[in-house]
């Protein structure tokens, strides 16, 4: 009502939670069946890796991204995300999403988008993210957050 057009509105969601009880893919599919009938401009699925499979055996035959994209039936554009590091990852995500979000890779390889457009794939930072960020001069809060998030499992 108060924003100038065009003003896009989207919704980012987590398809599953690790906790019990928590959101399960079945719950998310129920929600998406309703959201696809709204006037949202896009949906953005939150995934740590784009090829993640649901916890439920009922949904183990495809990736979560595939289930989400199928459920939307092309009615709302989907933003896919999750450990997208190279051209093949982008192409794989685009098979089940209209847009791709790049997060961690842009931290360790800030020119990644330029390299992608200019077909300089050989220059992509390919070291695992958990190692690559440690070689950068990052602001202390970001570095400390990443260190806390990626500390080795005991």
Label each PLM-derived region with a short phrase:
Residues 1-154:
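Flavin-dependent oxidoreductase catalytic cores
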């Amino acid at each position: 009502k108060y924003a100038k057009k065009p003003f896009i509105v989207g919704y980012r969601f987590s398809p599953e939670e690790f906790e019990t009880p928590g959101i399960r893919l079945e719950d998310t599919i129920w929600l998406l069946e309703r959201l696809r009938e709204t006037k949202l401009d896009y949906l953005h699925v939150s995934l740590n890796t784009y090829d993640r499979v649901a916890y439920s055996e009922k949904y183990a035959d495809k990736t979560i991204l595939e289930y989400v994209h199928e459920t939307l039936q092309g009615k709302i554009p989907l933003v896919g995300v999750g450990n997208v590091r190279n051209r093949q990852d982008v192409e794989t995500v685009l098979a089940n999403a209209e847009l791709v979000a790049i997060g961690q890779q842009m931290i360790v390889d800030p020119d990644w988008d330029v390299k992608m457009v200019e077909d300089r794939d050989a220059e992509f930072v390919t070291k695992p993210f958990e190692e690559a960020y440690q070689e950068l001069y990052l602001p202390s809060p970001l570095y400390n957050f990443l260190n806390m998030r990626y500390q080795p499992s005991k």
